[in-house]
Amino acid sequence: MGNLTSARPAGCKIVETLPATLPLALPTGSMLTYDCFDTLISQTQRELCIASYCCNLRSTPEGGHVLLRLLELARADVRVTIIVDEQSRDADATQLAGVPNLRYLKLDVGELPGGKPGSLLSSFWVSDKRRFYLGSASLTGGSISTIKSLGVYSECEPLARDLRRRFRDYERLCARRCVRCLSLSTRFHLRRHCENAFFSDAPESLIGSTRTFDADAVLAHVQAARSTIDMELLSLVPLVRDEDSVQYWPRMHDALVRAALERNVRVRLLVGLWHRSDVFSLAAVKGLHELGVGHADISVRVFAIPGAKGDAVNNTKLLVVDDEYVHVTSADMDGTHYARHAFVSFNCAERAFARALGALFERDWQSSFSSPLPRAPPPEPATLLPVN
């Protein structure tokens, strides 16, 4: 299967949350999310910036400890800024209120051009513009201990500064600054990497002239795939949904089909299954799975956490192409996520790191928590009717 911790491009480490029911069955050499967050807090000397959909750390003991560490850090004269979505519940707001050097801000993505409802889906930390975490673990106790998640920790200072630029734009949006007043700048993008890595963004209104739209980054590599596409996610929804309309969004779905049918690329999707699974996602991946006949090598499996309660789910968001490119994010392959929600993804084209994450995907794909979707039975051979 390979060494899960062998590759360190841009000072990268793989970060995971594995619920208590999984570690024995899913061996890992990855850094744990709890340890990653604790390390970031310990290393910060000047400022710590955190973007997350919500802040609900007290839901588990481990999360409660992280909250206490954040409060201690702020009281030690270190600036701590937490940005969450405008619509999120203020579960920890009372504990955060009135703490010196700590700001708790809310971002209304619906204020972006277009005026459509949206959410902040970003999940990242930036410490002193020198180190960062980005992944699917939000600022909740569940993400630290009960929800399977994946992220990347890096001490690459140029990348950390580039991610801090995104946070600065979020801060200004919280202050109701118009998008035209934002720099929306980046040093690295699809055509210019830093140690084989760069960030991509959504929605398009936060791209500016130099950033890479996240869907474009993903599609560029899926459409260039030569041998394998492995994708682990919570949902794949080929729709953009508004309150009063639904628009078909086939870009990702069609790119996967074309890769398998036209270029003989092996396509594997591992989809998290839970009580809130999107019915359109299940229908879409079943359709892809049924195409896996003849020369088309497409297969779909579902990953379910045994005895899962509440929001316990496989929230890993990972794409590995040809064991050469990886994409780690907090969003799903969902048209609405790309069109309406705000998030940042990590992209890396370093072969050894891609192989390490490919080994992690293989571990999950082959695990006892993964099961194949049943295929429809083949049709009966056609019978020629007599001609009268």
Swiss-Prot record:
Keywords attached to this entry: Host endoplasmic reticulum, Host membrane, Late protein, Lipoprotein, Membrane, Myristate, Viral envelope protein, Virion
Cell location: Virion membrane; Host endoplasmic reticulum membrane
MF terms (GO), sorted A to Z: catalytic activity
Gene: P43K
Domain of life: Viruses
Any Pfam family: PLDc
Membrane topology listed for this record: Lipid-anchor
Record-annotated PLD phosphodiesterase domain positions: 310-337
Protein name per Swiss-Prot or TrEMBL: Envelope protein F13 homolog
Region (Disordered): 369-388
UniProt source species: Molluscum contagiosum virus subtype 1 (MOCV)
Primary role: Envelope protein associated with the inner side of the enveloped virion (EV) membrane.
GO cellular component, one term: virion membrane
Residues linked to a lipid group, N-myristoyl glycine type: 2
Disulfide bonds: none
